[in-house]
Amino acid sequence: MHLVLSLLLLLSAEPAQSKLPIELREGLAIRGVTRGGRVPFPLDAVQYAIVAGTFAKPEGGAEIEFGEAKRIWERLVAEEDGSIRGSAFSGGYAYFEVERPQREIAILEATGHGMAYVNGEPLAGDPYGYGYSKLPVDLKEGPNALLFASGRGNFRAKLTPPPASAFFNLSDATLPDLLEGDSAPNWAGVILVNATRSPLTGLVVRTQVEGGKAADTETPSARTPLDLQGGDSNRSLRYDRRFDGRPQAHADPLRSNARLPEAQLRVRGPRQTRKVTFLSQIDGSVQYYALNPATDDAPGKALILSTHGASVEAIGQADAYSPKPWANLVAPTNRRPYGFDWEDWGRKDALEVLEHASQKLQADRSRTYVTGHSMGGHGAWYLGLTFPDLFSAMAPSAGWVSFFSYAGGQRIEPSTGIADLFSRAANPSDTLGLVRNSSKQNVYILHGDKDDNVPVREARSMNVGAGSDRQDVPISRAARSGPLVGW
């Protein structure tokens, strides 16, 4: 089933665009001017200069002091396909300059970077290279400075003309799966890009499900429901968008003949895994979790919360399980395939999903379990030990213990009152320090003896810690290597 979205708006005409796109292929790079990790204050010589107001246009051969070392800006050239190896500016920055004959709006499409500065304006990055970052930038007449912090893997960037003054970016949409025979409303989140220099007004979003009639909705508020009429059955899809409009003078109607964006919506049967969208009470955004439903709809079943590993989508996590006759399985997103290791906002997302799903499925809260693999195994430890009242059992698989044991986090030795504050602020991440909370829980630990991704010592340390108060913690070991052992 297709969902078609179109945007009708009133806005003043934009000046003609100059020749775009422009691929960023030649610039300067500097390596080794940052030191991050799980520390309260990462070191960054370039960012320090930006904040201090001393950063200037770099020149080839120019030096930056970083501790006792001196780093040099070096010439940077992209490969034939336009990509730049991440190692070319690992732990550093890449700088490009783009000359424009006039002021204009462009869309920055970049991947593999931690963040960007365009003429000093900070912009979010796409560190894992998903390719969904399409950000409008206001280029000035003359030279424009583009500075990119290093991310993961290869980097590429280009400036493209906006397809319209306002357009949808569907590459990062949060869309539901529709359930056969279900007329309940759903939520969807779609990014609307404003490629102008002013707030827009008079916006109307038109939605149409394949085979149904179109519905127009004005968007004067931050959140707007949109009605969609399906083909054989009536369904409604609520579209969440954030936009504050202000009146504009001298507005002219604008209509685009470009192809309307279409979003693919899956229609799933009652026993199939599916995406369930909801409106988050944390920040008002649309989020989803994946549901692997039990083999029948009887209420009062157990609920399994499954936390995914790094780079795994929640729907893929749910698909990895066979359906259970006795339990529904729910996989939250962590707000992204990487998120923050199920801590902080990842923790909040998991707890919100647990509550939403428990109510919706009428779960037996005395039979709520948490499991997860790799990063999700850490999530199972972290959630299960931090909230032992919510889970009657936990089953971490190939899970690491904490930032201090696995992810390179540094413990701050209290020496002053301020240092002590930061040390205590890190206590929620000290999973091993919470292990006694498992004294009333059932715990099953699964780990590979030769796991070359998460060392088996992580499981053994938790087994010893849990065993200090109890002697019935089972640990299953597989004498194989690789992060997916025992999955």
Residue ranges and their predicted role:
Residues S438, Y444-H447, D451:
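Short beta-strand/loop motif that positions the catalytic acidic residue
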Residues L175-L178, G212-A298:
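A domain-start/cap signature at the N-terminus of enzymes
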Residues P299-A310:
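Short beta-strand element of the alpha/beta-hydrolase
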Residues K450-D452, V456-W487:
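C-terminal catalytic histidine-bearing segment of alpha/beta-hydrolase fold enzymes
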Residues E14-I84, E97, A149-D177, Y289-L291:
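Accessory carbohydrate-binding/adhesion or oligomerization-edge regions at the termini
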Residues T295-P299, E343-M375, L385-F391, N437:
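Gly/Ser-rich "nucleophile elbow"/oxyanion-hole loop immediately N-terminal to the catalytic nucleophile
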Residues G309, S392-V435, K440:
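Mobile cap/lid helix-loop segments that gate and shape the active-site cleft of serine hydrolases
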